[in-house]
């Protein structure tokens, strides 16, 4: 089934009903027409309807059979109906012939109408008057038409039933009319006419049957709900809307109104129309040329009028004279103008050349004279061609010399800006007028005109792409591979693509050569540009070499910046042996016991010394730097990642502060290890060492043992294992150690935050609100230590209710201290349920 409901092998939909066809048959064989004739105009309309398949062949045959059934008793109407049937057989195509030669129609015509009512063996002349004579005449006409149809249908397998009925009647003794009753000279002529008539009828062109396919027969695009299928009325194929959008009338198929055809049929019909127009226009041109030749012929025309018997010779002579005149006019124009591009004027031909040749043409051998004139004209045209070719060769030899002279000044292009090189005065420049372009430009234009284009046109590219698409679709479809030899469109496209192969190779070779040329020119331009930039930079360095550029607002050279994260680290470690490189945690502090006041009274460290004393492996060197405000103390790890090329002015504004690397740790402390902490009396270095190695909390020095940074050499041999009283394990959140930073930090300090994947945006603000300030950490630690010692003495095995109430009264204070990590680790400490923190809305 095709789309929306018709069988795949059906013919086009009928556009006329059987009643309308019956009415037309009645009009064609009307009773008002005398002597059994038919109305030819209506009869040919009927044949066009049947041939164009506006009505099916079977319905047309049955309409004619119905007409015979209604009028078989009237000899005149029966004769006109037989003539209409014969006309339809000769003009309605092979499909209608199959229906006429069927058993249904032929048995009714022969066995019923002829044998019963118009039997020539039973009817004799003289019996029954004129009525019998008319019947005998109708019977003979039936036998005559049957004999003609047998001749027409012979050698056709599907039309054998007519020949069978013919042989049956002949065996029964019916005498058929003899078509060869004339003299023997006309026998061959009658046979040729019969064969011609048979060929014409059998080969009469009719619209083909519609074929069905699931793809367009041109582009092979499958049909769908949007891509509808359409049948071509000329070839019967199925096509998409894109390739069947043309409508033309098909007169040769009996279709007078415009109908849908495919692109191939449209091109074929359009080509035939153009050919017919060209033939008609050539006939008009020949007629005009004859009139012009008669005008120029003078006495030749009068002489040809006298010789009316030799019309063919006169026509050949006229053509010869026309060619002669055209050649002479072109030769005269070329010799008179003196230029190769001069065009002979049409108003130039005069009557003198024919007048001078009149005696020659009238006397002697006219044919020999005309041949000599033709040879002279051809020689003149060849001579003119040679002179033009020599002029072009001389002009091309002069052009290379002029082009080399014009290209020399352009080679010194980069020296134009310097007055020392007078390049323009050493080379003469060619002078050109406004009407004459430079010879190099003329040569380029002429080369572009002479060199044929090697690139493929858009139509050729589309042909290649279409061929590739079709071949890819054929590779994936085995059904198409079987029919590939019968696909005329694909074979034609293959022939076109094969012809394009040499052109494609030339185009590819030309493109490769152009690419190599352009690449070489690009390399030259890059080299010249680089050399010019170096030269210009040297000039600028020489011009500004004597001036000193201040380094206050400029950076350190690039080499120093590059060495910040590479070689400078090793050099700093060698120059500062008293500062060990630490990968994690905080730097060790060595020296004598000092207080914070003494540390603040020390002279400020210079910027160079400060940056040299910074730890090298803080773990944050790869982080990007952030700008600093003037009133905000910078973070130490932030200072460690600043480039060494920072301005001196910013270094001088920074206070001498200590470095606290590795501050970006999880903001929430770990409370799960409180029960596993060791007692206070045990050495704290073990706890510190274990907790530092695990990474849960860092080591912080107390306020009483903060070292002097300038006396680091005195404690150079100290190790973490021997420093038993310098470090205390705390569970504070990981921000700077408990130092008195009141003089260094403003009261409302906002720490500089850096981008980190492990911290929320407001981690430090939340920590400062949730935990106690740094100033009270040491004091709270001492106080808590004393309280725990007293509690351990008076503590019983089970806590009292009063202690629980006391704990509730001090819940908020204990929570802050517990979170800050200032409490000592005790083995006898019991787990106490902490109150749930309030959620800030």
From Swiss-Prot:
Start and end residues of each stretch annotated as Disordered: 273-317, 329-371, 384-459, 558-841
Biased composition regions of type Acidic residues, renumbered to the chain: 361-371, 669-678
GO MF term set: phosphatidylinositol-3-phosphate binding; ubiquitin binding; zinc ion binding
Biased composition (Basic and acidic residues): 776-787
Domain of life the protein comes from: Eukaryota
Binding site for Zn(2+) 1: 216, 219, 240, 243
Gene3D superfamilies assigned to the protein according to its UniProt record, in alphabetical order: 1.20.5.1940, 1.25.40.90, 6.10.140.100, Zinc/RING finger domain, C3HC4 (zinc finger)
Protein's membrane topology: Peripheral membrane protein
Biased composition (Low complexity): 392-411, 428-457, 558-584, 819-830
CDD domains: GAT_Vps27 (cd21385)
Domain VHS: 30-177
Compartment(s) where it occurs, according to its Swiss-Prot or TrEMBL record: Endosome membrane
BP term (GO), one: protein transport to vacuole involved in ubiquitin-dependent protein catabolic process via the multivesicular body sorting pathway
Domain UIM stretches: 314-333, 369-388
Domain notes: The FYVE domain is involved in the binding to phosphatidylinositol 3-phosphate (PtdIns(3)P) which is required for the association to endosomal membranes. Both IUM domains are necessary for efficient binding to ubiquitin.
Protein name: Vacuolar protein sorting-associated protein 27
Gene source species: Candida albicans (strain SC5314 / ATCC MYA-2876) (Yeast)
Gene it is expressed from: VPS27
